[in-house]
Design a protein with these regions (language model features):
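N-terminal, motif-rich segments that launch catalysis or mediate targeting to/interaction with membranes
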Residues: 18-124, 133, 138-252
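Bacterial Sec-dependent N-terminal signal peptides
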Residues: 1-21, 25
Length: 252
């Protein structure tokens, strides 16, 4: 038995913010709103131009020691009563700083294709991350990772409930979820904004998430009923905003 392989697979199962299904659904939604010019530019950069596939690359690479320096790019932790603009910024970076770095690189005509591919895959992923409220959580509980709860009787934590459990319990593929989102939400209703405003929006949402759950709570169907619509809206919103961001980069 290959225990090393089993260990790696187990570790990867804990490394997918929004979960693989959520991230890929967001990428799939974004593809519906790209301009033709943006599509062509993405095809020049990525061997596989699928944004759904690109969306999980940044998590898949986290088991690589060379990518550990980018771990802080996936989130930002700050006090619940302090806006990001007024908070102390981490020297290791955070999701807002990382999105800005990616956008700057993709607009740089002197950047290599390899650099652009790296930053494009990261950008697709990070726009999803910033819309998961617990990626804008409190440092003291590591974005809900230290809030232990029961999910249908099984031990887990609040962060994982939002990342994967609620989405995965509906047993939809990412394409089915993306179609469901587009059939239930309208892109024209989404306020686009930028990452500086997205972070404020997610902070407001995470304060609500924290207010509803305590350590050792038991969660199940009622919690799904109360929160899945918000999760779906966040996934769809991330997709629409990702498309707008990419169109602004590649088709100004």
């Amino acid at each position: 038995m290959n225990y090393k392989l089993i260990y790696i697979l187990l570790m990867l199962s804990f490394l997918f913010p929004w979960g693989k299904t959520g991230h890929r659904a967001t990428g799939e939604v974004a593809e519906s709103y790209l301009t033709d010019k943006t599509r062509l530019e993405i095809e020049k950069i990525l061997k596989d131009p699928s944004l759904a596939v690109a969306s999980t690359w940044a998590d898949e690479m986290r088991s690589n020691p060379n990518f550990r320096k980018y771990s802080a790019w996936h989130y930002v932790n700050m006090p619940h009563n302090v806006r990001y603009i007024d908070s102390k910024k981490s020297s290791k970076g955070d999701v807002v700083q990382a999105i800005k770095i990616c956008k700057k690189n993709l607009k740089d005509s002197n950047a290599s294709i390899e650099d652009k591919a790296f930053h494009l895959r990261f950008l697709v992923h990070l726009v999803g991350d910033i819309h998961q409220p617990l990626h804008v959580g409190r440092a003291e509980d590591r974005g809900g990772n230290d809030i232990k709860v029961k999910w249908f009787g099984n031990d887990t934590n609040l962060h994982r409930v939002w990342d994967t459990h609620i989405i995965d319990d509906f047993q939809m593929s990412y394409t089915e979820l993306a179609n469901h989102l587009q059939n239930n939400f309208n892109a024209a209703d989404i306020t686009l904004m930028t990452e500086d405003e997205w972070i404020d929006e997610s902070q407001q949402l995470v304060n609500m998430v924290y207010s509803e759950v305590k350590n050792k709570d038991s969660l199940g169907y009622t919690y799904i009923y109360e929160n899945f619509d918000l999760i779906k809206l966040q996934l769809f919103t991330a997709g629409v905003r990702l498309a707008d961001t990419l169109n602004n980069i590649f088709d100004e």
